[in-house]
Amino acid sequence: LVIDSLQRHTHAAGYAERRRECEEAARLLGVGFLGEVPMSGLERAKTLLPETLYRRARHIVSDTARVRLAVDLMASGDMAGLGELLTASHASQRDDFECSTPAIDTAVQAALGAGALGARLTGGGFGGASIALVRRDQVDATSQAVADAVEQAGFPRPTIFSVRADGGAHRDA
C-alpha cells in the first residue's frame, strides 16, 4: 500500500539540515559519504561524533545495510523478513534521522497493527507518504484500519492505494 498523508513536504529546511549533518559526520569520519562506513564502523563513529551526528550516521549506515539485505530477501521471496526491514527502517528514520511526522507514524503503526508485514516512511520525509507491505487478502482491511486510525488521531484522512511490486525498469534484449 502507498499511504499519502496529505501533508505537504516541509523538508526544504529539514532535509537540507540532515544533508549538512551527514556531510559533517562523513568529514569527521574521514569518508566521502556515510554509505562507505560499514556496520562495524559504527562503534568507532560513536567515539568520534557528537550524539546528533552519530544518530544521523547510524541511520544512514544501518539503512544502507538494510537495503543490501532487502535485495537478498526479495530474491529469496522472504516477504516477512523484508517487512521487518521496512519497519526497522521506519524506526531509524523516526528516531535517528528524525524525519517522520506524527501522522505518518500513526499510519505506520496502524498498518502494522492491522497485520502488515512491514511499513515505513518513504521519500525524503518531513511529510509525504509511507508504504506498507500487505498480503493481498488484507489490502482492504488494512487500508480501512489505517484511514480510520489516522483520522481518529486528528489528521486528514489519507489517500491510500494498492500497488504491486514489479521487476522494475529493464532493457529488452
PLM features per residue range, with description:
Residues 127-133:
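Short beta-strand->loop micro-motif that forms the acidic, two-metal-ion catalytic signature
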